[in-house]
Amino acid sequence: MTLKYYYSLILSLLATLSVSSQQVVVTELPTQRLLPVAHIHRILQDSEGYMWYATEGGGLCRDNGYQINVFRSDLNTPHLLSSNDITCLAEDNGHHLWFGTKRGLYRLDKANYQINEITDGELKKQRVDAIRAIHDGTIWTSAEGMIYHFSSEGKCLGSYPSEWKGTRRNVTDFYEDGKHQLWVLQGSGGLLQYHPSTDSFLPYQWACDAPPVQMIEDIQNECYWVATWGKGVVQLILSSNPQSKEVICKLQPATLEGYEQTPHKTQILGLLKDSRQGVLWVSAMDDLYAYRIIDDALHPIDTENFLPKGRKILDRIIEDRAGNVWVPGYSPHTFILSFDANKIKRYPTSAMSAITGYPVMA
């Protein structure tokens, strides 16, 4: 065996130990009992540090750490929203909060908390699948196989079909990388890239036999990590020639291990690389996974000593400004991973866990 092999093995072991020995603390969302519904679908930390929650059926929620402000249609505000199912969130440079629902797109002005529906003809009353505010202050969103571009004031700047091999595909996410390139990830499709010079989206080479769900740029390793629906996490390496669309797609065996027994492990909902340790956190259909990145490969980190036990139903994860990882969930409820050894705790309710097969925290 080569010296490089031993070096990589030692690094891998040290990486695993460094994470597991840090006393990762899991705490349930402190304001969980104040939510209008138990389940959070998406989380956003705004420019002022407040947390916003997209819920299914409970509307949009703002959390200041002590109380929850709820924006939804109810007896007091029956016509505020066409749907209380919030699908996606974004904040633009003008401090407007944009959010999609199952029946339309809305913009909230944080100066007065007034909510306006974006009444573009085609988009009105459609399910909004994804939204992204980018560096120039504009907003990109998608609904029913179409992509829409809006100014911060809510003016539609353009609309584009989200096509892959001649067929319209729904968008799972938008992503703007460090070079301000805008990417579109398609369910049942592939990758598109926006070209400002022609105001058009062009397909990018996507050799993986599974649709992309979310992507992040890894500047340190000069690649992108792409969550897929069915093939785990893929490493995407672009050509050094900016004119070339050739890419290298590397499957990551660590995210495919045990596929036959646990196929949901390869169905990824979201991922992020945390800023504190450089760990890649991955929420899949069955659990939350953690990986250390060594030599362009993912190496699993043992999470049994700090994560809730049993099967989990989670959603897309985020990192806050303090480096904590927020995990929205159905079972268990939303929880936060932090690295403060002075904080404890989670309290599993074993009786309910035994009955349901899912972890319950009190």
Language-model-detected regions and their locations in the chain:
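Carboxylate-rich, polar loop motifs that coordinate divalent cations or form catalytic acidic clusters
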Residues: M1-A362
